[in-house]
Structures are given as C-alpha cells and as structure tokens.
C-alpha cells in the first residue's frame, strides 16, 4: 500500500525543547495564536486547540492537495499541531487513512480530541514522532510527503533533514509538497513577508523566510524536482516536488 507522509506545523528545531518553544512563541506572536474550545474542565473537548491560521488556509491547501496527492494509501502527518488540518483533510480525502503525529504531548492531546470529536473512520490516533530522529519510524516506500508552515520557523538544518528523508523514503514519482512563504531570487514577494521575516530573525537568527531557489537546490540534491510553484492566499506558495531517479 502506498504511504503518504505529511508534515504540518513545525518540524524539529534542534531539540524537542527548541521545538516546543518555537511553536509556542510563533503561535503567541504571529499567525499561530490558538484558543481552547470553551467547555468545562471535565470535557475532553477542552483539549481541542483552534489556530485561526489553520482555519483560514486549510481550504486553499486542500484544493492543491486534492489535485497532486495520490488517491489512496496511508497519510502520516508529522508535526500536526492542533489537529485541525488532520481532521479537515481526512474528512475530505476518505480514501486515505490519515495518521497524525507530533513530538509535543500537548499537541497530541489536541489532535486526539479533534479526532474523537470528528469520529472519522480514516483518522487514526496521533503518534509521537520526531522528524529529525533517524531513522523515521515509517514505511520505506512513501507516496507523498507534505510539509505545511515549517521550514521558516526552524533552523535550515530541519529543511535539509526533510529533503534527505524525502529522498530516502519517497517512491519513484512520489510527491513532496511544501506550503509557506518564500523569497524569490532573494527578494520578498510582499512587504508583509519582509516584516514577518524580520520578526522571525529577531526571535531566532536561525529562522526566516527561505529563498525558493535554495529550497529547489535541496530538492535536486535528493532527486526531487520542483514541478510548479503555486501562488496561494496571503503571499504564500505551494511547492510541488516529484521524486525521480530510483
């Protein structure tokens, strides 16, 4: 069976502590600020976190995923964050089995609360998984990898590890799908992205909006060739790579 590996949110930023701190800071100060479902403390729904950015971007992202991803297989989602993407994508793609994951226990609790709330037959309970801990505890043959809003809020080494893992795990013609803001030819595509990049680098000099051309070079080194950059709302892009040369 084909397997789809999906990374959303933040991959590992050096260590689990770095990851938790970077995710918490980004959600507090940038677009990932989330709220908790307003229920009483005894209700497991209180664990369901809501990130406004995930609510806004899930529809446009799904439109592209529906077009480029294989139609069947197991979807392993890494760094699932709140779990909103997992629920939305699993509901819209019922022919795949969605396997969310996150290295952060609180995030896994939110994902599981969303899973129980949605009660989808094709959405599994979240697992603990650190993307920078090799070898990845996933099957060797992956049909696709999807990474949403990660490489700009993590050190460059996280992007390198992502492409290395993708090159090792994707089957021939497998897809690597990235979503987020990018510079083109070293220039920001909008003033808001430039301001966001400045905020990121003040917070952590290892973070920042990446040059699309540098990301493309990582792909080439892993036999992953970009087919198309898809412009998205709010000055983001989807980058679609395909595995060749197996």
Where do the model's predicted regions map?
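Conserved Class I S-adenosyl-L-methionine
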Residues: 189-210
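Class I SAM-dependent methyltransferase Rossmann-like catalytic core
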Residues: 37-70
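Short alpha-helix
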Residues: 206-223
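A short acidic, Gly/Pro-enriched loop at the edge of an enzyme's catalytic core
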Residues: 136-145
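Class I SAM-dependent methyltransferase SAM/SAH-binding core
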Residues: 87-134
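Conserved beta-strand signature within the Rossmann-like core of class I S-adenosyl-L-methionine
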Residues: 173-182
């Amino acid at each position: 069976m084909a397997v789809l590996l999906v990374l959303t949110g933040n991959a590992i930023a050096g260590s689990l502590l770095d990851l938790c701190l970077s995710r918490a800071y980004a959600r507090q100060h940038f677009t990932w600020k989330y709220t908790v479902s307003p229920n009483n403390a005894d209700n497991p729904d209180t664990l369901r976190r809501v990130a406004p950015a995930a609510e806004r971007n899930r529809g446009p992202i799904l439109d592209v995923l529906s077009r480029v991803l294989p139609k069947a297989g197991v979807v392993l989602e890494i760094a699932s964050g709140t779990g909103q993407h997992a629920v939305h994508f699993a509901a819209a793609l019922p022919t795949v089995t969605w396997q969310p994951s996150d290295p952060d226990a609180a995030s896994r609790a939110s994902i599981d609360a969303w899973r129980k709330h949605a009660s989808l037959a094709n959405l599994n309970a979240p697992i603990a998984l650190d993307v920078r801990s090799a070898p990845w505890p996933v099957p060797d043959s992956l049909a696709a990898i999807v990474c949403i809003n990660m490489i700009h809020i993590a050190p460059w080494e996280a992007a390198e590890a992502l492409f290395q893992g993708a090159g090792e795990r994707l089957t021939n013609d497998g897809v690597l799908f990235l979503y987020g803001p990018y510079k083109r030819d070293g220039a920001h595509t909008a003033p808001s992205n430039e301001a966001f990049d400045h905020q990121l680098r003040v917070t952590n000099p290892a973070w920042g909006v990446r040059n699309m051309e540098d990301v493309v070079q990582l792909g080439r080194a892993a036999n992953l060739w970009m087919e198309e950059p898809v412009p998205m709302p709010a000055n983001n892009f989807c980058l679609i790579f395909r595995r060749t040369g197996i």
